[in-house]
Amino acid sequence: MASGISRTPATGVTAGGGDDEEAAWLHALELISGFTVSMTLKAAIQLGLIDALTAAADGRALTAGELVAQLPAVDDAEAATSVDRMLRLLASFNVVRCSTEAGPGGDPLRRYSPAPVCRWFTAGDNHQGSLAPRLMLDVDEDNLSTWHQMAAAVVSGGPSAFERAHGMPLFEYMGTNHRFNMLFNQAMSQQSMMVMNKLLDRFHGFDGISVLVDVGGGTGVTLKMIISRYKHITGVNFDLPHVISQAPSLPGVNHVAGNMFESVPKGDAIFLKSMLLRNDEECIKILKNCHYALSDNGKVIVVDIVLPETPKPVPEAQNPLRMDVMMLNNLRGGKIRTEQEYAKLAMDSGFSGSFRTTYIFANFMAIELCK
């Protein structure tokens, strides 16, 4: 390997040394090619690389060759080179860690180990939840194709980009595409598991509730988690008939089929997790039905991502703002809201009592709307 390489920077310029024009150029390139990180991470998960790095004995860092030995590769040498290049990119984004040593021929040999973020991309502990299914959903071809319709949807109004791409709204499409429906449900259930674990640790608004109604509760997994911690609660899992028909029998949970736009079962408290991502008119209709179903001193507990009032270039703002534009793309009238917008929804729906918020995790908040 040549050792006499030298580099002379342009006069007055040091690489990465504060040239504003260069910094803006590199930022532009990052925005253009950011998808390469998501797609490379997807491939790394599909190949089992993240799981293998996380499961390595005694935290040992592995070479690309050692990782490829576990794969059914046709050409191990070629595959090892490809894996090394993939992990090298992920290391530059702090997805994995990289150390370098001298290889057998004197060339650099890179070893990789998991960075902290890998815990959210492994199959791992089923009770923790994983973001791997969420990644697979977001970069799925059925999702990515919809973004090409975003500009047309903005100009034309009416149908969302998703609806323009697939000829029908998101949830209707899920009913026709079993593969995509399974992908969506797995992503949502895994993310919900993570959020609910944090909610049960940090939110104490379930004390004193006798009957808790989970509107849009799916197969009852969320209620099962709540009741395992608050055993005095009787749960009512409320969802559409075709969902309830698949719900298993759960101790302390009564499954009820219906439509939240028509009526909601009565209870001391009503739980709405990720149900108010719709337009204002639909959200107010849901909340008014909840208000009617509550006992005199009852409350609605909303658990959702909350937007910051001001956009800032920090992850705490970027994450909810990305989600908001995903709602714009996928659902007609869909949106993420600020605290003030939730407060207005509550007032417009008849909730005149206290409005309390508890920060949970990763921009999720628990919002209590008291009757």
Curated annotation (Swiss-Prot):
This is Probable inactive methyltransferase Os04g0175900. It holds the Pfam family Methyltransf_2. S-adenosyl-L-methionine binds at residues 216, 239, 260, 273. One of its GO terms (molecular function) is O-methyltransferase activity. Belongs to the class I-like SAM-binding methyltransferase superfamily. Cation-independent O-methyltransferase family. COMT subfamily. Substrate binds at residues 137-143. Residues 170-188 are annotated as: Substrate binding. Its EC number is 2.1.1.-. GO terms for biological process: biosynthetic process; methylation. Disulfide bonds: none annotated. It comes from Oryza sativa subsp. japonica. SUPFAM superfamilies: S-adenosyl-L-methionine-dependent methyltransferases, Winged helix' DNA-binding domain.
